[in-house]
A protein has these predicted regions:
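C-terminal/domain-terminus segments
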Residues: 6, 145-173
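A conserved mid-domain beta-alpha-beta active-site/ligand-binding segment of alpha/beta enzyme cores
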Residues: 130-131
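Mid/C-terminal beta-alpha module of Rossmann-like enzyme folds, strongest
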Residues: 36, 42-127, 140-142, 146, ...
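A broad, low-specificity signal marking well-ordered, structured residues that form hydrophobic/aromatic
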Residues: 21, 60, 149
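NAD(P)-dependent short-chain dehydrogenase/reductase
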Residues: 1-44, 77
Length: 173
């Protein structure tokens, strides 16, 4: 599942509709602690697990190692996409985004983006899952640290780096 694509496409479509960037989750979700995992970090952790004999048959949690709250990150995301922050509004992305394929096709043509079918570009159900959680989502990295994996990533930097990568690869305008 790719939360970065959900956020990027949601912001792009909201902007095209002239809407502010509204947090689509519950009020509790907006204030809860949340963790993410950078795919490059996960790849490095998988190599570590596969090559360190102490890791054989051991389960590990792998996250960036920091915590975010959407309430702190949301204004920065809005700024990144050149948008105002809208009021938080619990939105079912699966419903709101269901009829936006033709709009997405126009955005793709207008900005000469890569043509990826709309139903493949973002997992709105995953977005509903992430933004529907009304509680902290925290996984302990203690075991991985005890076994020797100490790498971390800054989640805010991760999001903006990935958004930059999506722009550079013509996935979003």
């Amino acid at each position: 599942m790719n939360l970065v694509m959900v956020l990027a496409v949601y912001a792009t479509i909201s902007k095209a509709l002239g809407m502010p960037l509204r947090h689509p989750g519950t009020q509790e979700n907006y204030h809860a602690l949340y963790q993410c995992t950078d795919t490059a970090l996960l790849s490095r952790a998988l190599v570590w697990m596969a090559t360190d004999s102490r890791c054989a048959n051991e389960p590990f949690n792998i996250t960036n190692g920091d915590l975010i709250r959407w309430e702190n990150l949301w204004p920065k995301m809005a700024s990144y996409f050149g948008m105002e922050v809208g009021p938080r509004q619990h939105i079912k992305l699966t419903e709101m985004m269901a009829d936006k394929a033709s709009l997405w096709d126009r955005i793709v043509s207008q900005h000469e983006l890569r043509r990826i079918p709309y139903d493949k570009i973002a997992s709105w159900g995953y977005g509903d899952f992430v933004f529907g959680a009304g509680f902290d989502i925290i996984s302990s990295m203690t075991k991985a640290r005890r076994y020797g994996f100490h790498e971390v990533r800054d989640t805010e930097e991760m999001f903006f780096r990935m958004f930059d990568d999506l722009r550079a690869s013509k996935m979003i305008p």
